[in-house]
Design a protein with these regions (language model features):
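Class I S-adenosyl-L-methionine-dependent methyltransferase module
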Residues: 55-179, 183
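Conserved proline-anchored active-site loop of SAM-dependent methyltransferases
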Residues: 38-52, 65-69, 133-140, 147, ...
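Conserved Class I SAM-dependent methyltransferase catalytic core
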Residues: 231-279
């Protein structure tokens, strides 16, 4: 029996708690057609990816994952291809962290590691992946945020017992990533379009969400903003992959325009729109943790999800 896989990184907008609702809206053919190519253009922390890898009822012919964050994708590759080298670097960093007995010492070490990470001084991909994971697990509230120059700028988080080197998880994730035919891409989401296999592609699209208000979200995961113009480009991408015969599901916020109408129901007119309800646990203001409605858009009907949506609204 293979070990249990879980996301190796904390990532805002992670889908772990939403998966039961999302799976209720899956197209039925992913359970019956082993020739399907599964694509995630915005893989992020990989909650959906790892869940599907472990689902014994789903068998994909091929998997394509992509993210614009090069360091995140370097982590995926390091975990898949060289987990023991990565663990060696993580153990070294973990030893240094716990050697510091005061919070001031741990804080100084954090900023020294952050400076090394931002300077590009790492001597290997595994060292850079290890620093990425260390910063993610010891920074404030598990955020990933960069400034306009692309430098990671989240402060030290003062966590009591951060798990810096989760050897069991990294080895489990590596085993699962090596159990399938998987291609890992870095860059703009649109490049996955060339991997669409007509009639045999399911794509889960989880882009940066449109903020519910001008002050409702922290700044970017990369130094490339994902504004309304980008949301419109993404809709055009969905039109293209639909025309190529791909099946897709897209998540986003239930953002409203100035008149109070749903931004995404208007933008994706002609597609199927549902609601799901998300507990949000990573936020710059950690005390704000509540269930928020989100939009789920598909290019196929799903009565089970529509019934679920209606019951939530009543």
């Amino acid at each position: 029996m293979m070990p249990h896989a879980k996301p190796f990184v904390k990532w805002a907008g992670g889908k772990s708690k939403l998966i039961p609702q999302l799976k209720a809206a899956f197209p039925p053919q992913i359970y019956t057609d082993p020739s399907i190519t599964y694509i995630e253009p915005f893989v992020g922390g990989g909650a959906m990816l790892f869940h599907l890898l472990m689902d014994e009822h789903i068998h994909f012919k091929r998997i394509i994952i992509n993210d614009i964050n090069a360091d995140l994708m370097n982590c995926y590759r390091s975990i898949k291809d060289s987990p023991h080298d990565l663990l060696k670097e993580l153990h070294r960093i973990e030893e240094l962290h716990w050697h510091m007995h005061s919070e001031n010492g741990k804080s100084e070490l954090f900023y020294a590691h952050r400076d090394r990470y931002n300077s590009g001084a790492c001597t290997s991909e595994q060292e850079r992946a290890a620093l990425f994971l260390y910063l993610n697990h010891t920074c404030f509230n598990g955020l990933y945020r960069v400034n306009t120059e692309g430098a990671f700028n989240v402060p030290y988080g003062k966590r009591k017992k951060p798990i810096i080197c989760n050897e069991e998880r990294i080895l489990a994730d590596s085993e699962w990533l090596n159990s399938v035919d998987i291609t890992m891409l870095t860059g703009d989401y649109a490049q996955v379009e060339s991997y669409v296999d007509k009639g045999h592609t399911f794509m889960y699209i989880d882009p940066p969400y449109k903020p519910l208000s001008p002050t409702s979200s922290f700044k970017e995961y990369s130094n490339t903003p994902f504004n309304d113009k980008e949301q419109e480009h993404l809709k055009e991408f969905c039109d293209r992959i639909s025309a190529q015969g791909a099946t897709f599901m897209l998540s986003n916020s239930d953002a409203r325009d100035e008149s109070g109408d749903s931004y995404f129901q208007r933008l994706y007119e002609g597609y199927h729109c549902h609601h799901v309800y998300a507990p949000r646990s990573i936020n710059p203001q950690a005390q704000i943790r509540k269930h928020l409605p989100e939009i789920l858009i598909t290019n196929y009907p799903d009565h089970e999800q529509e019934d679920y949506d209606s019951s939530q609204q009543s």
